[in-house]
Amino acid sequence: MWSIFEARPKEAHSVNKIGWLRASVLGANDGILSLSGLLVGVVAANADIKVILITGVAGLMSGALSMAVGEYVSVSSQADLEDADLQLERREMDADWDAEVDELAAIYRGRGLDEELSRTVAVQLMEYNALEAHARDELGINIHTTAKPTLAALSSAASFSVGGIFPLLTSLITPLEYLSLVLPIATMFFLGMLGFVGAHIGGAKRVRAILRAVVLGLLAMAATALVGRLLEIHALSLQYAI
């Protein structure tokens, strides 16, 4: 039986991949859908290839920067909140150590330990690392996985760019007269592959992940194509009115 202070052998659980897998899939999915939706809308408005490519490059750059800034702000805010909670916990332990022991013991009693054992565990954990014990069991914070806003921002921008480059390249190599048909089909393929890769890495059901990505992506592109078509009709009506 392992002691609570001994290192356990690591087990390969899929849940351990949730953080980085979610961020990577989310960024790449946003890149594919944002660029595809934007390009489909422009194509539906009968824009020429120059306008389509300029729109695609601008969308890729603005989307990547937006993802980076949003992720940086989000992770920084989370880090600030966690740090404030840890500082408060330090002050509470300095002010009344015994009360913090009782608080930790009460948490363990709520998880099924008896009175004596819960207090023994609380005392030993606080003697070993009081802040870590309270951060983990009271606040739900792992002090060993500190937030890295810059890394998170760069990763988010990179994953968005990787996803967005595929529909942009599709627009580059496809003749304009076929683009309205090829781009949605290619996007469905890209989304399906992304769903498959995410499900494979995470150990989830692949068919469900693929269908979810493809169906939702198709709905998003249909909406943007409709908007583009309506804008073209409106522009033509204004032109004839003038």
Curated annotation (Swiss-Prot):
Induction info: Transcriptionally repressed by CCAAT complex in response to low iron supply conditions.
Record localization: Endoplasmic reticulum; Golgi apparatus membrane; Vacuole membrane
Job description of the protein: Has a role in both calcium and manganese homeostasis. Involved in the transfer of iron and Mn(2+) from the cytosol to the vacuole for storage of these metals.
Topological category with respect to the lipid bilayer: Multi-pass membrane protein
TM helices/strands, residue ranges: 25-45, 49-69, 153-173, 181-201, 213-233
InterPro entries reported in the protein's UniProt record: Ccc1_fam
Domain of life: Eukaryota
GO molecular function, one term: ferrous iron transmembrane transporter activity
Positions in the Vacuolar compartment: 46-48, 174-180, 234-242
Catalytic activity: Fe(2+)(in) = Fe(2+)(out)
Ranges per topology, Cytoplasmic: 1-24, 70-152, 202-212
GO biological process, one term: manganese ion transmembrane transport
Record's signal peptide: none
Keyword Glycoprotein appears in the UniProt entry: no
Name of the protein in its database record: Fe(2+)/Mn(2+) transporter pcl1
Organism of provenance: Schizosaccharomyces pombe (strain 972 / ATCC 24843) (Fission yeast)
GO CC annotation, single: membrane
Assigned protein family: Belongs to the CCC1 family.
UniProtKB keywords: Endoplasmic reticulum, Golgi apparatus, Membrane, Phosphoprotein, Transmembrane, Transmembrane helix, Transport, Vacuole
Residues the record lists as Phosphoserine modifications: 3
